Amino acid sequence: MGSAAPNLHAKVLATGVEEPIVSDPSPLETNDWSPDGQWIIYTKNTRQTGRDLWLKPLSGDGNPHAFSNERFEEFGAGFSPDSRWVAFVSTESGRPEVYVAPVQQPGQRKRISTGGGTTPRWSRDGKELFYASADNRAIMRVQIAPGSTLTTGLPTRLFSIGESPAARDGRRNTIYDVSPDGEHFLVGVPANDPGSSRVTVVLNWTAVLKPEKNQ
């Protein structure tokens, strides 16, 4: 699935043919495709409300509709493994926090993070939700009991990641992902900084290129 601004396209892998699935004059960014194949959730960026989440059904009338359309920003969405829930980031509290809401009842959202958070990721069994702390220096974990209602535990610090690239350059999202078994994490970290490099200035450098005369 790719984007050719400002439209969203799906590519048929067998043929390589791209088909437009969402057309809009506003900038769009794909977030996730539901595991059951029924929904695509994407971010729409407008001057009026900033980034909002929209749902595109892949059956029925196929018309996109707003998952959120508020004065605050919402982004970074991901479907639960059973496709019933969406984890996402919202700034409605005044800072980025992680929330979970039913796919078709986004107003029944529940706040998951307690001290700020970004980049939510579900475990494959849907029983855990991970996210990056507000300072982008730790991965947090919340126990989830999915069902007709959502029961969650309190966030716990899973491990520290030091100064992530997001913390260093001020981006909102830590670059990481979770393995399918939920036991391993791939985290983007800055390369070792060897310190400032020494700069050598060579004057009259053309003279160095002249062949030496035989003595």
Set out the residue ranges of the language-model regions.
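Exposed loop and linker-edge segments at protein-protein interfaces
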Residues: D181-V189
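Conserved loop/turn at the beginning of each blade in beta-propeller domains
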Residues: D24-S26, E70-F72, S113
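C-terminal terminal-structure detector
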Residues: V178-G182, W205-T206
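Residue-level detector of Asp-centered blade-edge/turn motifs that repeat once per structural unit
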Residues: P35-D36, P81-D82, R124-D125, P180-D181
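Beta-propeller blade-edge and WD-like acidic-aromatic loop motif
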Residues: M1-P20, E29-T30, D36-A66, R84-W85, ...
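Short helix-to-loop capping/linker segments positioned immediately adjacent to catalytic or ligand/cofactor-binding
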Residues: F75-G76, A87
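Hydrophobic beta-strand positions
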Residues: A10-K11, D32, G78, R121, ...
